[in-house]
C-alpha cells in the first residue's frame, strides 16, 4: 500500500516568549518532519503568537505532529485546518532588475491587471508585491520569469491562514 502524501495546514496559538519558535521548529526537526512554510506573528493578545504551519505528509505523520504540538507546554491551542474552509494567503515580492522604460510600463500594466502593488521603483528596477494564494503566486513568478528572463529576484513569506467567515459555493 502506497503512503499518500497530502498538503496540510495547521494553526497553533503559542506563548509569545523567547525560545518558543525554536522549540516548536526543533520539535519538527527532531522528528525529521519537513515544513513547507512556518509563519509566526503576535496576535491581538501580546502574550500569544499564532503560527501557521504548512507541510506535506502522510496521515500517520500528521496525527503524530498534532499530538506533539498538543503535548507541548508552550502551545495554547492547535487548529487543524484539514476539513474546514479557510482564507489563506502568502506574501510575495518580485523585483525586476535592468528595466528599460518599456519594461516598467509593462510591469505597471501587469500590476494593474492582476491587482498587484508596485511598492518601490527607481531608474533600473521595480519591486512588486503580491498577496495571493500560493498557486496564484506561483503563476505570477512564472509570468515574470517568462517576461523578464534572468532579471527577477523573488522573496516569499510563509502563508497565513484563518477560518473563513463563509463556505464558498462550489
Model-based region annotation:
Residues 1-49, 57-170:
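Long, contiguous binding/interaction regions
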Amino acid at each position: 500500500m502506497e503512503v499518500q502524501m497530502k498538503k496540510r495546514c495547521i494553526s497553533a496559538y503559542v506563548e509569545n516568549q523567547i525560545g518558543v519558535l525554536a522549540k516548536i521548529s526543533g520539535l519538527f526537526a527532531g522528528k525529521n518532519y519537513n515544513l513547507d512554510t512556518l509563519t509566526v506573528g503576535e496576535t491581538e493578545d501580546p502574550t500569544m503568537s499564532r503560527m501557521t504551519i504548512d507541510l506535506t505528509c502522510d496521515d500517520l505523520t500528521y496525527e503524530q505532529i498534532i499530538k506533539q504540538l498538543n503535548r507541548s507546554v508552550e502551545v495554547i491551542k492547535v487548529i487543524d485546518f484539514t476539513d474546514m474552509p479557510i482564507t489563506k494567503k502568502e506574501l510575495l515580492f518580485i523585483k525586476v532588475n535592468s528595466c528599460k522604460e518599456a519594461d516598467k510600463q509593462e510591469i505597471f500594466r501587469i500590476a494593474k491587471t492582476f491587482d498587484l502593488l508596485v511598492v518601490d521603483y527607481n531608474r533600473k528596477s521595480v519591486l512588486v508585491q503580491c498577496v495571493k494564494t500560493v498557486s496564484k503566486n506561483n503563476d505570477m513568478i512564472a509570468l515574470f520569469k517568462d517576461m523578464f528572463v534572468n532579471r527577477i529576484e523573488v522573496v516569499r513569506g510563509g502563508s497565513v491562514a484563518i477560518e473563513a467567515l463563509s463556505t464558498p459555493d462550489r
